[in-house]
């Protein structure tokens, strides 16, 4: 009985850790610029296909940005979203 309970707890913990949505950096100031194709860059949390479409942070020394897969509960699958994160954090 104990091994079964241990396995169930491990599985539940793994689902919580792996399934956690990463912060996209919505509150971090970013540079809203015009891209070479004439469109505006996409802010954190918006859908993207490549990193060049995403707005960069104002503080480029401490923050990084890009386009990465995020879990979407609305679509029930992974979608690419722009993000900005603190370089020294473990989630970046």
From Swiss-Prot:
InterPro entries: Cys_Knot_tox (IPR035311)
Primary localization: secreted
MF terms in GO: ion channel regulator activity; toxin activity
Subcellular compartments: Secreted
First and last residue of the signal peptide: 1-19
Keyword Transcription regulation: no
GO cellular component annotations of the record: extracellular region
Swiss-Prot/TrEMBL keywords: Disulfide bond, Ion channel impairing toxin, Knottin, Neurotoxin, Secreted, Signal, Toxin
Tissue specificity comment: Expressed by the venom gland.
SS bond list: 41-55, 41-82, 54-67, 85-92
Role: Probable neurotoxin with ion channel impairing activity.
The protein, known as: Toxin ICK-14
Organism listed in the record: Trittame loki (Brush-footed trapdoor spider)
């Amino acid at each position: 009985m104990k091994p079964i309970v241990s396995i169930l707890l491990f599985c539940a913990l793994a689902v919580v850790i792996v399934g956690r949505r990463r912060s996209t950096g919505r509150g971090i100031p970013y540079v809203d610029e015009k891209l070479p194709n004439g469109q505006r860059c996409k802010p954190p949390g918006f859908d993207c296909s490549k990193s060049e479409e995403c707005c960069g942070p104002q503080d480029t020394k401490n923050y990084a940005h890009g386009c990465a897969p995020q879990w979407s509960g609305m679509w029930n699958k992974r979608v690419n979203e722009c993000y900005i994160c603190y370089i020294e954090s473990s989630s970046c």
